[in-house]
């Protein structure tokens, strides 16, 4: 294994450890797929076993987006956020990476632990699944963001057991 890859794995393990330490032993987590027009939301159970799509926020301006997210977090009793990080296929930052990192910093008023999670392939995987299920274009556009959020969240909670 090359040195840079090993360094990245160790860094991700440390991020996961810190995130888990900041969380209560049990409680729901929310997954977010942050786009320019929408924010897909997903939830997992309090045991961190299964993630499910929840809803989609149509973005307007950040203060309104944050208020809708705050309401969702309170209603669902969310204890931590897993936010999809849009990286290029080679792992480098994409044009959207910086704006998603800024979004993650701007949700600080929610006072929740935040984990940034590699979201490469999430939307493509979900779209492929929906195509295989013969979902119409309208149905795909209606659910793809919250399903991508569930895909991101499931990846994160699956990794909890590994590290």
Curated annotation (Swiss-Prot):
Location(s), subcellular: Cytoplasm
EC id: 3.1.-.-
Pfam families: RuvX
Top-rank lineage group of the source organism: Bacteria
GO molecular function, one term: nuclease activity
Enzyme class, broadest EC rank: hydrolase
SUPFAM superfamilies on file: Ribonuclease H-like
Keyword Hydrolase: yes
BP GO terms, sorted: rRNA 5'-end processing
GO-annotated cellular components: cytosol
Family: Belongs to the YqgF nuclease family.
PANTHER family documented for this protein: POLYNUCLEOTIDYL TRANSFERASE, RIBONUCLEASE H-LIKE SUPERFAMILY PROTEIN
NCBIfam families in the record: RNAse_H_YqgF (TIGR00250)
HAMAP family: Nuclease_YqgF (MF_00651)
This protein's name: Putative pre-16S rRNA nuclease
């Amino acid at each position: 294994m090359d040195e840079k890859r090993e360094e990245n794995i160790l860094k991700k393990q440390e991020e996961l450890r810190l995130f888990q330490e900041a969380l209560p032993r049990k409680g729901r987590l929310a997954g977010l797929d942050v786009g320019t027009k929408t924010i897909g939301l997903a939830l997992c159970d309090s045991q961190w076993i299964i993630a499910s799509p929840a809803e989609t926020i149509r973005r307007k301006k950040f203060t309104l987006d944050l208020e809708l997210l705050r309401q969702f977090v309170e209603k669902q009793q969310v204890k931590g956020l897993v936010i999809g990080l849009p990286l290029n296929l080679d792992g480098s930052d994409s044009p959207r990476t910086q704006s998603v990192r800024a979004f993650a910093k701007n949700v600080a008023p929610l006072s929740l632990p935040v984990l940034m999670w590699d979201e490469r392939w999430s939307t493509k995987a979900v779209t492929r699944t929906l195509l295989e299920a013969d979902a119409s274009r309208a149905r795909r556009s209606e659910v793809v963001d919250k399903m991508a959020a569930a895909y991101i969240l499931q990846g994160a909670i699956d990794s909890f057991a590994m590290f």
